[in-house]
């Protein structure tokens, strides 16, 4: 359910685009992201940094799209977001010796430090790739194709990446039999 909630602005963007076009979809995405943050704040009393970053980007790039009536800006937003994620993962690891992936997953997995570093680097590389893929589709195909890719392509790529990551990490996961021994 959280997965769908996280996709709420993207799904509304997609539906609105199909009916009313890119500018209405952009306005709806801005409003939906504000609503999403309001709901998270109401339910949990705090909002993740990642969601705040997404809000700032959708407001900046979305507003530029609407004010200038130029869809180029909204097409850049996913790439900038993905590249910020990649940079945050790499900078936190290299400079601050903090592995955000380990912080998020340490309750589910116990891994040797070099493996955590590889997992962190693979997520950073994946986000960098996603940013590049977004720009490739955005500026080499129609806006309609880009909107479809933004929802279905990104979800598909994420699913494939998570499955591959799970396969890579499966040898480190303890089975119930291992835990009983």
UniProtKB/Swiss-Prot annotation:
Membrane topology reported for the UniProt record: Multi-pass membrane protein
Highest taxon, organism lineage: Bacteria
Keyword Cell membrane: yes
Entry similarity comment: Belongs to the YciB family.
UniProt cross-references to PANTHER family, sorted A to Z: INNER MEMBRANE-SPANNING PROTEIN YCIB, INTRACELLULAR SEPTATION PROTEIN A-RELATED
NCBIfam families reported for this sequence: ispZ, PRK00259.1-3
Protein name as it appears in the record: Inner membrane-spanning protein YciB
The species this protein was found in: Nitrosospira multiformis (strain ATCC 25196 / NCIMB 11849 / C 71)
């Amino acid at each position: 359910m959280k997965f769908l909630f996280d996709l709420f602005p993207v799904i509304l963007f997609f539906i609105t685009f199909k009916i009313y076009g890119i500018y209405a979809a952009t306005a709806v995405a801005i409003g939906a992201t504000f609503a999403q943050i309001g709901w998270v704040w109401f339910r949990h009393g705090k909002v993740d940094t990642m969601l705040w970053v997404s809000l700032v980007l959708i407001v900046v790039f979305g507003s530029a799209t609407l004010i200038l009536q130029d869809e180029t800006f909204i097409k850049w937003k996913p790439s900038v977001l993905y590249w910020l994620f990649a940079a945050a993962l790499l900078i936190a690891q290299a400079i601050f010796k903090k592995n955000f992936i380990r912080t998020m997953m340490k309750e589910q997995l116990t891994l040797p430090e070099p493996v955590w570093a590889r997992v962190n680097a693979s997520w950073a590389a994946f986000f960098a790739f996603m940013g590049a893929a977004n720009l490739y589709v955005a500026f080499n195909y129609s806006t309609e194709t880009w909107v479809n890719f933004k929802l279905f392509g990104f979800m598909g790529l994420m699913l494939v990446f998570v499955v591959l990551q799970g396969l890579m990490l499966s040898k480190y996961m303890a089975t119930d039999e291992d835990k009983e021994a």
